[in-house]
Curated annotation (Swiss-Prot):
It comes from Bacillus cereus (strain ATCC 10987 / NRS 248). GO terms for biological process: cytochrome complex assembly. It is a single-pass type II membrane protein. Thiol-disulfide oxidoreductase which is required in disulfide reduction during c-type cytochrome synthesis. May accept reducing equivalents from CcdA, leading to breakage of disulfide bonds in apocytochrome c; following this reduction heme can be covalently attached. The lineage of its organism: Bacteria, Bacillati, Bacillota, Bacilli, Bacillales. GO terms for cellular component: plasma membrane. The gene is resA. This is Thiol-disulfide oxidoreductase ResA. GO terms for molecular function: antioxidant activity; disulfide oxidoreductase activity. Belongs to the thioredoxin family. ResA subfamily.
């Protein structure tokens, strides 16, 4: 009986050690890049829900609030109405909001956009390549991109209306 218990403990210890070792190995050798503040934002091309092409480099000369989100993400859901409310005011001032969904179905994203009557461009990051390029963890994560196309700040987590407005002011050309 004691032999079985000892064997069981050794097996559990080996499994846990292997899991910890694998996690450390993955973290150390991960190829994902971390977005560098002050560097040019990586360009991307997506198609929004209305079929229009969105290419980041086309927004040079404007500030860009790039938001990564998901329909299942409660903090994302809370901040979207604030973004929608502030969008017309800051669009007139040369700021664009682009919301990139984290690889969900078209129907889920379209239903969400319709439910909240979102006015800013929304696209789906099919395959999650843009999220990988920008090193996004967790959702929501947003990037402030200035008129020269440089990333000036990364914002993780849900934002209040007041915080969003401060960020939009920061990237107003």
């Amino acid at each position: 009986m004691k032999k079985n218990r000892l064997l069981f403990r050794v097996i559990i210890l080996l499994i846990l050690s292997g899991a910890v070792g694998f996690t450390l190995y993955q973290g150390y050798f991960s190829k994902e890049e971390k977005m560098e503040i002050g560097k040019e934002a990586p360009n991307f091309v997506v198609t929004d829900l209305e079929g229009k092409k969105i290419e980041l480099k086309d927004f040079k000369g404007k500030g860009v609030f790039l938001n990564f989100w998901g329909t299942w993400c409660k903090p994302c859901e809370k901040e979207m109405p604030y973004m929608n409310e502030l969008y017309p005011k800051y669009k007139e001032k040369g700021v664009e909001i682009i919301a990139l969904d984290a690889d969900e179905t078209d129907i889920a994203v379209k239903n969400f956009v319709k439910q909240y009557d979102l006015k800013f461009p929304v696209a789906i990051d099919k395959g999650g390549e843009i999220i990988k390029t920008y090193g996004v963890i967790p959702l929501p994560t947003s990037f402030l991109i200035d008129k020269d196309g440089k990333v000036i700040q990364e914002i993780k987590g849900e934002q209040t209306k007041e915080q969003l407005e401060e960020y939009l002011k920061k990237i107003t050309p």
